[in-house]
Amino acid sequence: MEAPLVSLDEEFEDLRPSCSEDPEEKPQCFYGSSPHHLEDPSLSELENFSSEIISFKSMEDLVNEFDEKLNVCFRNYNAKTENLAPVKNQLQIQEEEETLQDEEVWDALTDNYIPSLSEDWRDPNIEALNGNCSDTEIHEKEEEEFNEKSENDSGINEEPLLTADQVIEEIEEMMQNSPDPEEEEEVLEEEDGGETSSQADSVLLQEMQALTQTFNNNWSYEGLRHMSGSELTELLDQVEGAIRDFSEELVQQLARRDELEFEKEVKNSFITVLIEVQNKQKEQRELMKKRRKEKGLSLQSSRIEKGNQMPLKRFSMEGISNILQSGIRQTFGSSGTDKQYLNTVIPYEKKASPPSVEDLQMLTNILFAMKEDNEKVPTLLTDYILKVLCPT
């Protein structure tokens, strides 16, 4: 199949006069001949493509001629192409920028762009400077700029290091201003023990202050170097004594912390078991109400049936079995699902002080046995009464 023919004679005849009438508008004459001679010899072959486009006979010829023209244009990369595509001057660039500033679309696209404060991107030397840096260096510079900017915005300033005296003063203020809620709940005897412990703490703080003063006065290498042997020995004894005192205090505080944690666990377990027993007692009460209601309905229906039926014999096997079953229910409970020890009442005597950890442990064991309906409930309850309520 032959390629379609192209008839361009009439169109180019119409274009020639328009190009001749307005010679100043040279870019509008796309297919006209070049009005001036090309200076570059490598582009001299383009002069042969002046009016030959009119003699094209098919699309294939048009494509081939276009390929040849491209090859001629891109043969020499160093050739000057200002005659073919003139570069815009500075005035035209400024006019385009002014028109872009009035465009709403351009403003919407460029509002989120924040240039770097340390670099002016309009500087022509900035491209050469950035070209010599690698991507990692550029990335590091950007991170440094971002960190500096965030620090300046947030106003973060490094606090100066505190001396030992300042730290001790802050600790004293914290201990004086922060009341301990546990000490308020303790009895008078424990308060006396707390006063003695606070006095011991104040003594330790005084020793720390005296020790730090000696350290601050003689901490430098030169100060220690000029001290005599007896002074160094005395200072060493002070340091070792302070270390022993602080170690003992640390051990006591850690032991106290362990005791408080254990007491907290015992209280939590007691509260948990108590809530579980109360929930089970509530379920059992609801179940008993339901059974009583069903029993009342069954008795009412049985009375109606007995009125319609003949009276049974006085001493029958059915009557004897019913009597035995009712006696067993009254002795051991109505059914095997009833909890025998769930509703056990635990005697408790309210005192001025809260129950101790040992008392809470005994109560927790009793409640756990009640929840499981264990046979150990009477034994545990007896031990609790003898040891807590009526100690010998």
UniProtKB/Swiss-Prot annotation:
Family indicated by similarity: Belongs to the zygin family.
InterPro entries in alphabetical order: FEZ
Post-translational events: Phosphorylated by protein kinase C zeta; which enhances interaction with UBE4B and polyubiquitination. Polyubiquitinated in a UBE4B-dependent manner; which does not lead to proteasomal degradation and may be important for neurogenic activity. Polyubiquitin linkage seems to be mainly through Lys-26.
Keyword Nucleotidyltransferase in record: no
GO terms for cellular component: axon; centrosome; cytoplasm; dendrite; Golgi apparatus; growth cone; microtubule; neuronal cell body
Phosphoserine: modified positions: S58, S298, S316
Superkingdom as given in the UniProt entry: Eukaryota
Stretches for region Disordered: 1-37, 175-198
Name by which UniProt lists this protein: Fasciculation and elongation protein zeta-1
Function: May be involved in axonal outgrowth as component of the network of molecules that regulate cellular morphology and axon guidance machinery. Able to restore partial locomotion and axonal fasciculation to C.elegans unc-76 mutants in germline transformation experiments. May participate in the transport of mitochondria and other cargos along microtubules.
Gene: FEZ1
Main location: cytoplasm
Comp. bias intervals (Acidic residues): 180-194
Quaternary state and interactors: Homodimer; disulfide-linked. May form heterodimers with FEZ2. Interacts with the NH2-terminal variable region (V1) of PKC zeta and weakly with that of PKC epsilon. Interacts with UBE4B. Interacts with SAP30L. Interacts with SCOC and ULK1; SCOC interferes with ULK1-binding to FEZ1. Directly interacts with SCOC and UVRAG. Stabilizes the interaction between SCOC and UVRAG during amino acid starvation.
Keywords (A to Z) from UniProt: Cell membrane, Coiled coil, Cytoplasm, Cytoskeleton, Disulfide bond, Membrane, Microtubule, Phosphoprotein, Transport, Ubl conjugation
BP term (GO), one: negative regulation of autophagosome assembly
Result, substituting K264A: No effect on SCOC-binding
Pfam families cross-referenced by the UniProt entry: FEZ
Organism the protein comes from: Homo sapiens
Subcellular location per the Swiss-Prot or TrEMBL entry: Cytoplasm, Cytoskeleton, Microtubule organizing center, Centrosome; Cell membrane
Tissues/organs with expression: Mainly expressed in brain.
Effect of L254P: Loss of SCOC-binding. No effect on ULK1-binding
GO molecular function, one term: gamma-tubulin binding
Membrane-spanning intervals of the chain: none
Coiled-coil annotated residue ranges, if any: 230-298
